[in-house]
Amino acid sequence: MSRYRGPSLKKIRRLGALPGLTNKRSKAENDFIKKLRSDKKSQYRIRLEEKQKLRFNYGLRERQLRKYFSIAIKTRGSTGKVLMQLLEMRLDNIIFRLGMASTIPAARQLVNHRHVLVNGRIVDIPSYRCKSRDIIMARDEQQSNTFINNCINYSTHNRMEAPNHLTLLHPFKGLVNQIIDSKWVGFKINELLVVEYYFRKT
């Protein structure tokens, strides 16, 4: 399944806020309509939609998300928490959470166009897994700084503060303090439902 490139509002109306996909917000539904919709959902659909939240928020293909789940199963610890750590420590997401890009797709574009350095070296792989003490910064070129500055200006009013595991040293440079704790994930998700979804598919 390919990466989603359709209307973002269509997805957030169905799944709720997806800050990695877009900083737009859908119009709030009244409580009665929300309850009516939730009452009609099967358990399978509830698990599916929670899985889709992950896919669309982080901009992943189904095959990519399934691969992360396979890694999480084989890793010591809670499968759901490990899965969230793997997704949150992707380079494109770190750039987004630092506020150097307005969305994860915008962050991915920065990486693909070789505007980003990790520990002084160009990294052009959005899925690169960041580690504790990694330093993320723009290349020392006017084009890179301008590109990131435009992203920062665009997202200033919607940008959240950097979570505890990250420090924005200045607009073009950030530090990974540590591996993320699950309580610092940037949007509402029940990762246990995602784990249940994949376990039931196997």
UniProtKB/Swiss-Prot annotation:
Main localization, broad class: plastid
PROSITE patterns on file: RIBOSOMAL_S4 (PS00632), S4 (PS50889)
InterPro entries recorded: Ribosomal_uS4, Ribosomal_uS4_bac-type, Ribosomal_uS4_CS, Ribosomal_uS4_N, S4_RNA-bd, S4_RNA-bd_sf
Keyword Cell membrane included in the entry's annotation: no
Domain S4 RNA-binding intervals: 89-152
Record's keyword terms, sorted: Plastid, Ribonucleoprotein, Ribosomal protein, RNA-binding, rRNA-binding
GO MF entry, a single one: rRNA binding
Protein's GO biological process: ribosomal small subunit biogenesis; translation
Subcellular location(s) per record: Plastid
GO cellular component: plastid; small ribosomal subunit
Highest taxon of the lineage: Eukaryota
HAMAP family, alphabetized: Ribosomal_uS4_B
Record function comment: One of the primary rRNA binding proteins, it binds directly to 16S rRNA where it nucleates assembly of the body of the 30S subunit.
Family (UniProt): Belongs to the universal ribosomal protein uS4 family.
Subunit (UniProt): Part of the 30S ribosomal subunit. Contacts protein S5. The interaction surface between S4 and S5 is involved in control of translational fidelity.
Protein name: Small ribosomal subunit protein uS4c
Source organism per UniProt: Epifagus virginiana
